[in-house]
Amino acid sequence: MSETGCRHYQSYVKEHSYDTFRVIDAYFAACVNRDARERKAIHCNCFECGSYGIQLYACLHCIYFGCRGAHITSHLRSKKHNVALELSHGTLYCYACRDFIYDARSREYALINRKLEAKDLQKSIGWVPWVPTTKETNLLLANARRRLVRPNQTIGLRGLLNLGATCFMNCIVQALVHTPLLSDYFMSDRHDCGSKSSHKCLVCEVSRLFQEFYSGSRSPLSLHRLLHLIWNHAKHLAGYEQQDAHEFFIATLDVLHRHCVKAKAEHESKSNSSGSGSGTNSSNSSSSHCYGQCNCIIDQIFTGMLQSDVVCQACNGVSTTYDPFWDISLDLGETTTHGGVTPKTLIDCLERYTRAEHLGSAAKIKCSTCKSYQESTKQFSLRTLPSVVSFHLKRFEHSALIDRKISSFIQFPVEFDMTPFMSEKKNAYGDFRFSLYAVVNHVGTIDTGHYTAYVRHQKDTWVKCDDHVITMASLKQVLDSEGYLLFYHKNVLEYE
């Protein structure tokens, strides 16, 4: 790999120098002064369709602006021009390579322009160019050719050894490893433990597991270290008897959440120790699940907000409370109202979950509006949704009379819209469509059985994970399965 990373850009610079890049970056990407900002607002639009906004490109060979996709691509192809500048972030694109490219000299000029922009706006610079380390440079030199993961490749698929009734753990790990946002986080090496005893950190162990899954090896993995860590931090799961997969899932999220918060607190404590000496004590917050106060990767992906509205039947006064959730547990048994109907689909379950429930005379509560004890109704709705929604179908029923497993078939969709279940349906902002990517199943009775999982490996490829055995599966097999835990990923992510 050359210093520029692209021989086409190297040829361009020899012929045209950096002058055009410096001008376009200064006036249409960085906008170094007020005149540049006004010029961009007036003239920076696609020459073909006239669109403004993000994802506009400027051809560095001639005076042409085109939007991402057909227009800039058509221009570069027809004119036999190779290099364009993306104007939102100032990144170089080579049409011949079909990729964004890096050039050290261009980055130096771009940084100068960003400093001028920051000075003109009287703000700190919020953009820093990527400068590869020696290690990264060597990796790039050794891997100059791009590697494509094709649909028929099995990278990311690993069987998991059953250590003695640990199928409940294996299927949850398969679901977590195939959670796209979680995979992006751990595969980009975002976790920095900062602890002297990283061998006790569950986040470090999960990070190592992700690396193992995507190492290219096909031999089954042993999760003995993960199991040991869970036993140490969730004592109720310790032992070799069969455990509940849902309980293990929630316990794993809780321990990961606590360890993420602890790692952050230790970093802050180290930085504060060199200042005023007043360290940060987060021992209490590390064990709490505080929605809106924690930005760890677990809460960013899995935490949503449940809204509960209690309506007084006397004065119609409404008392609203909010609670964070990591999953939604749905009843499958017969209802005591509506003719004792049992749900047939996931939508039926959600409709029953969000239906107003009359609390009755035996459960009167004091109304904060009329200041008296009155009968009331209670209704759940979803205030906010996480990036990943996990549904727990409550198939194991425990009562004073009988313990049983509900094996009735519940139809669940590949994709569906959660808007009808939001607290503010009419004013709900955003896209609430979700796609199925993992299903955990239980085969057997309430006393004994076996867990397996279906996971989406590629866009249209599903596999069945049965401990150390991984086999291809059809979508029909997935949708025909019983379903115990259902994992859905949001189709469109909003970034703040």
Curated annotation (Swiss-Prot):
Gene3D superfamilies from the UniProt entry: Cysteine proteinases, Zinc/RING finger domain, C3HC4 (zinc finger)
Broad enzyme group: hydrolase
The reactions it catalyses are: Thiol-dependent hydrolysis of ester, thioester, amide, peptide and isopeptide bonds formed by the C-terminal Gly of ubiquitin (a 76-residue protein attached to proteins as an intracellular targeting signal)
| Keyword terms, alphabetized | Activator, Chromatin regulator, Hydrolase, Metal-binding, Nucleus, Protease, Thiol protease, Transcription, Transcription regulation, Ubl conjugation pathway, Zinc, Zinc-finger
**Any single GO BP term:** regulation of DNA-templated transcription
Q: Which residues form the active site?
A: 167, 450
Give the residues the record marks as binding Zn(2+) 2.
46, 49, 67, 71
Please classify the protein's predominant subcellular localization into one broad category: nucleus
Q: Which residues bind Zn(2+) 1?
A: 6, 8, 94, 97
Q: Which GO terms describe its molecular function?
A: cysteine-type deubiquitinase activity; zinc ion binding
| Cell compartments where the protein resides | Nucleus
User: Deletion: any effect?
Assistant: Defects in the number and migration of glial cells located within the lamina plexus of the developing eye; the lack of glial cells causing mistargeting of the R1-R6 axons in the optic lobe. Lamina neuron development is normal.
Q: In which tissues is it expressed?
A: Expressed in the optic lobe and central brain. Highly expressed in the lamina precursor cells but not in differentiated lamina neurons. Also expressed in marginal, epithelial and medulla glial cells adjacent to the lamina plexus.
Query: What residue stretches are annotated with the USP domain?
Result: 158-491
- Which residues hold Zn(2+) 3? 59, 62, 75, 81
ZnF (UBP-type) intervals: 4-120
- Taxonomically, which superkingdom? Eukaryota
GO CC: one term? Answer: DUBm complex
**EC code(s) of this entry:** 3.4.19.12
Quaternary data: Component of the SAGA transcription coactivator-HAT complex, at least composed of Ada2b, not/nonstop, Pcaf/Gcn5, Sgf11 and Spt3.
Functional note:
Histone deubiquitinating component of the transcription regulatory histone acetylation (HAT) complex SAGA. Catalyzes the deubiquitination of histone H2B, thereby acting as a coactivator in a large subset of genes. Required to counteract heterochromatin silencing. Controls the development of neuronal connectivity in visual system by being required for accurate axon targeting in the optic lobe. Required for expression of ecdysone-induced genes such as br/broad.
Family according to the record: Belongs to the peptidase C19 family. UBP8 subfamily.
- Recorded protein name is Ubiquitin carboxyl-terminal hydrolase nonstop
Q: Which organism is it from?
A: Drosophila melanogaster (Fruit fly)
